[in-house]
């Protein structure tokens, strides 16, 4: 399939290390994928679901001890420990290679080695990057064939180039004591052993698209970010694009596939999804920032996905999808999860494969982190620009978190540098729903805390450098918080489709169509500039209350930020210290 010397030399090395019984190249053809699906069903690795109701859909169960990403077992193996930074785990690269190769040695005996050439981003796009993953798991092959562009076309584009990322995955014995996910940024190398779970083994996803790519982006002058990309089309047919970063459990996928309120739809407003998780962004020839989604599918959390919360995501899963660790309805050979509907199956198997009655059981049928892997093309609102190699121009970057008080519904940063500060202080708090008591504030700068492949202080500096490069063309930066609570612990803002009203204000600010009120933290909307027409059980007085900026609360917030910044030591850019001082000063006035 290729004569690329660097690829063939590495594969010889891998064959010698893991000693497979046979080697299969993944060419991307439907015939080959179909024969692999058949094989996976014969061995029990996958279960073929009801082909009338769920055509091309399959169910897979992971080992019970292998159900999520493992941050404690995830390492950045940079040559110098200080390049890894305080937010990552470090391992010395030579020691790591030795340990990993010892674990991997001979582990494919009796197994097949699958070689997956894949492109992150549209094949041949100037923003795309190529990887090769070697795996002993058909489940990984079939997921990668949904999540990335795979096959011969990728090798054709690669040609003789040595610019590609190596990925070795070995299931081994799924021994959690010997489970490691290691990244070697200087070597473009990822090694994952003793896991079969999505985020640990689909090496194109967080491992390559964020951890390795963030390092490449810093060195090559572009950005790899944990952000959705969506397009907003107005009644005149013009589309403007925004990217948005949220920590987990803040509704990123829901926002990416938002359906505008009925009043807006009737006027002709539409939302188009470009991506729900990762954005690669670089400056275009016209000086603006352009974004692509490096992925080709959605790896979404199943529980809570339903026709009300996110119809577009649910519709995306109705064909050609792999479900992982959800409940199996034996009556009609379909799947079920908590929050899908109010009618759990009685004759079912839970995510561990044990008999389960959803009406009487105390246990959950689906694992809380159970997943669907669905082709992006299935999404009813997928953007026409999805495969566009040069990407889409970004008008605004939105940061967000889950805060009960303090942070207003939306505010705009004063400028790019202040926007970097806003992203660096992003936080969510765990709310104990029953008591309405506010939990612990967990800061997750730009939602990249678990995914930045190098020192976060250098990462902040890279943001400042990108701002300098973009100059006048830099997108405007905003922060949103859909999660303000009243004193009884109820959400004040209706959220979901109504979030479109805030997006509309954001775009008006980008176009200079509305004024805003300057506050201690940035620009906040005048309440009358957010359209409340057709909104249920909500009034302008409540809106005013969630747009308030409480200086005393922000002064306290500044203390928390100062504490958080300490860990970055002298790698923290001086500009962030200056921004913090400005915030303190503004709150004291």
Describe the residue ranges of each PLM region.
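Conserved internal helical-beta-strand scaffold that buttresses enzyme catalytic cores
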Residues: 2-250, 260-589
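Hydrophobic positions on the alpha1 helix immediately C-terminal to the Walker A/P-loop
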Residues: 255
């Amino acid at each position: 399939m290729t004569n690329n010397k660097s690829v063939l030399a590495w594969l010889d090395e891998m064959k010698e290390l893991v000693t497979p019984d046979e080697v299969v190249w993944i060419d991307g053809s439907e015939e080959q994928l179909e024969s692999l699906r058949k094989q996976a069903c014969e061995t029990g690795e996958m279960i073929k679901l009801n082909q009338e109701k769920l055509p091309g859909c399959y169910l897979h169960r992971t080992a019970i001890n292998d159900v999520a990403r493992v941050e404690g077992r995830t390492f950045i193996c940079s040559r110098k420990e200080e390049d890894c930074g305080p937010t990552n785990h470090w391992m010395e690269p030579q020691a790591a290679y030795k340990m990993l190769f010892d674990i991997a040695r001979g582990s494919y005996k009796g197994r097949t080695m699958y070689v997956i050439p894949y492109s992150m981003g549209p094949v041949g796009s100037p923003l795309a990057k190529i990887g090769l993953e070697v795996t002993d798991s058909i489940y990984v092959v079939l997921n990668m064939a949904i999540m990335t562009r795979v096959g011969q076309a990728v090798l054709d584009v690669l040609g003789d180039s040595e610019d590609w990322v190596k990925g070795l995955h070995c299931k081994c014995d799924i021994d959690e004591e010997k489970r490691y996910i290691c990244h070697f940024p200087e070597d473009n190398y990822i090694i994952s052993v003793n896991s079969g779970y999505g985020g640990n083994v689909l090496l194109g996803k967080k491992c390559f698209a964020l951890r390795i790519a963030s390092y490449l982006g810093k060195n090559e002058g572009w950005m790899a970010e944990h952000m959705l990309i969506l397009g907003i089309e107005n009644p005149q047919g013009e589309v403007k694009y925004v990217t948005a970063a949220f920590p987990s459990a803040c509704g990123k996928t829901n926002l990416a596939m938002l359906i505008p309120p009925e009043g807006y739809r009737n006027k002709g407003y539409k939302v188009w999804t470009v991506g729900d998780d990762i954005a690669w962004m670089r400056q275009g020839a016209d000086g603006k920032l352009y974004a692509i989604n490096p992925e080709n599918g959605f790896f979404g959390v199943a529980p809570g996905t339903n026709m009300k919360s996110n119809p577009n995501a649910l519709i995306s899963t109705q064909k050609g999808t792999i479900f992982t660790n959800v409940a199996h309805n034996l009556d009609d050979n379909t799947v079920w999860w908590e929050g899908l509907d109010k009618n759990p199956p009685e004759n079912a198997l839970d995510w561990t494969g044990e008999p389960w009655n959803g009406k009487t059981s105390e246990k959950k049928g689906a694992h809380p982190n159970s997943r669907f892997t669905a082709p992006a093309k299935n999404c009813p609102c997928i953007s026409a620009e999805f495969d566009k190699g040069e990407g889409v121009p970004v008008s605004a970057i939105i940061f967000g978190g889950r805060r009960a008080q303090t942070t207003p519904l939306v505010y705009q940063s004063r400028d790019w540098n202040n926007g970097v500060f806003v992203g660096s202080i992003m936080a969510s708090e765990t709310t104990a729903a029953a008591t309405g008591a506010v939990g612990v504030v967990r800061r997750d700068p730009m939602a990249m805390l678990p995914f930045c492949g190098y020192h976060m202080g250098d990462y902040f500096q890279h943001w400042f450098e990108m701002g300098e490069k973009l100059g006048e063309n830099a997108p405007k930066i905003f922060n949103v918080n859909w999660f303000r609570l009243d004193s009884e612990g109820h959400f004040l803002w209706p959220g979901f489709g109504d979030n479109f009203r805030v997006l509309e204000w954001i775009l008006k600010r980008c176009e200079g169509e509305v004024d805003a009120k300057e506050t201690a933290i940035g620009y906040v909307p005048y309440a009358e500039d957010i359209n409340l027409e057709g909104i249920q059980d909500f009034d302008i007085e409540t809106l005013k209350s969630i747009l308030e900026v409480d200086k005393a609360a922000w002064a306290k917030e500044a203390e928390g930020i100062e504490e958080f910044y300490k860990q970055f030591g002298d790698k923290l850019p001086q500009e962030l210290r200056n921004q913090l001082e400005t915030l303190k000063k503004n709150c004291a006035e």
